[in-house]
């Protein structure tokens, strides 16, 4: 399959999250990231806009009873920029994680315009 989106990491946050996971979880994350890179219309089950934010999305990963989220945004339409990730343990996404992602997104675009 031909890639229609490029996936990049901003700073080290995603890599630290990824490296801390089991091989099984890493495999599932890789599957979902591959899907996002090759499918034109990604199902909401895997990628959804974060309500109350401007341009912030969450990548959704489920493995058994474990739920993981990775925050990201789009840049120039075809580039997906990954920020922080975490294991979701409650129904509601922790505000601190959203704020961290918003801060990283702002830093990314500010740095890009320099």
Predicted features and spans:
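Basic, Lys/Arg-enriched alpha-helical interface segments
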Residues: 1-67, 76-80, 88-114
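ATP-dependent carboxylate-activation loops
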Residues: 83
């Amino acid at each position: 399959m031909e890639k229609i989106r490029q996936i990049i990491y901003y700073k080290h946050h995603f890599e630290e999250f990824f490296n801390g996971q089991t091989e099984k979880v890493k495999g599932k994350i890789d599957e979902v990231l591959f899907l996002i890179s090759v499918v034109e219309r990604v199902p909401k089950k895997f990628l959804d806009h974060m309500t109350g934010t401007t341009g912030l999305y969450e990548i959704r990963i489920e493995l058994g009873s474990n739920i993981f989220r990775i925050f990201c945004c789009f840049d120039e339409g075809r580039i997906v920029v990954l920020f922080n990730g975490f294991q979701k343990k409650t129904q509601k996404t922790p505000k601190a994680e959203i704020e961290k992602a918003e801060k990283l997104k702002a830093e990314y675009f500010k740095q890009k315009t320099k």
